[in-house]
Amino acid sequence: MVDKRESYTKEDLLASGRGELFGANGPQLPAPNMLMMDRVVKMTETGGNFDKGYVEAELDINPDMWFFGCHFIGDPVMPGCLGLDAMWQLVGFYLGWLGGEGKGRALGVGEVKFTGQVLPSAKKVTYRIHFKRVVNRRLVMGIADGEVLVDGKQIYTATDLKVGLFQDTSAF
């Protein structure tokens, strides 16, 4: 049985990356440097824009983060793909929180819009995931819309984020 808390600390997220949070068969978050959040501040089975589940997580920004040194030299900005990946990470994390088992894989996204950027001067990135549907049959899959905010201002939106959990990824 999964301990369905409403919030998770950085240590909890790191435990997920080691396969210790959702059991031996539960999905894992990536380890640092690809773990794109410091904490999950809210998880619910209802709520969100569609009343089918909601996740909110945060990433503290500091100018020494690895991506600022290489993307781009003289023009540091967090790659937009990392914000997108964070949203996929949270969809998979939610599926594990619901008790889903398997290895998480991003399956696609409907549309992504970038209307801002994360600079080294930012303080905090907030991710909000609004679930539209969870399929829990032979295939476990989450479908959600997401948004990324920097210091309270929305800068990315994504529709139809899809993540599946797979028992066997050898033919993926």
Swiss-Prot record:
Its predominant location is cytoplasm
The record's InterPro entries line, in alphabetical order, gives: FabA, FabA_FabZ, HotDog_dom_sf
List the SUPFAM superfamilies: Thioesterase/thiol ester dehydrase-isomerase
- Sorted UniProt keywords: Cytoplasm, Fatty acid biosynthesis, Fatty acid metabolism, Isomerase, Lipid biosynthesis, Lipid metabolism, Lyase
Tell me the first and last residues of the signal peptide.
Answer: none
Cellular component per GO? cytoplasm
Which transformation does this protein catalyse, written as a reaction? a (3R)-hydroxyacyl-[ACP] = a (2E)-enoyl-[ACP] + H2O; (3R)-hydroxydecanoyl-[ACP] = (2E)-decenoyl-[ACP] + H2O; (2E)-decenoyl-[ACP] = (3Z)-decenoyl-[ACP]
Query: A single Gene Ontology molecular function, please?
Result: trans-2-decenoyl-acyl-carrier-protein isomerase activity
**NCBIfam families found in the cross-reference section:** fabA, PRK05174.1
Protein name, entry field: 3-hydroxydecanoyl-[acyl-carrier-protein] dehydratase
Question: What is the species listed in this Swiss-Prot or TrEMBL entry?
Answer: Cronobacter sakazakii (strain ATCC BAA-894) (Enterobacter sakazakii)
Q: What is the lineage of its organism?
A: Bacteria, Pseudomonadati, Pseudomonadota, Gammaproteobacteria, Enterobacterales
What is the gene name? fabA
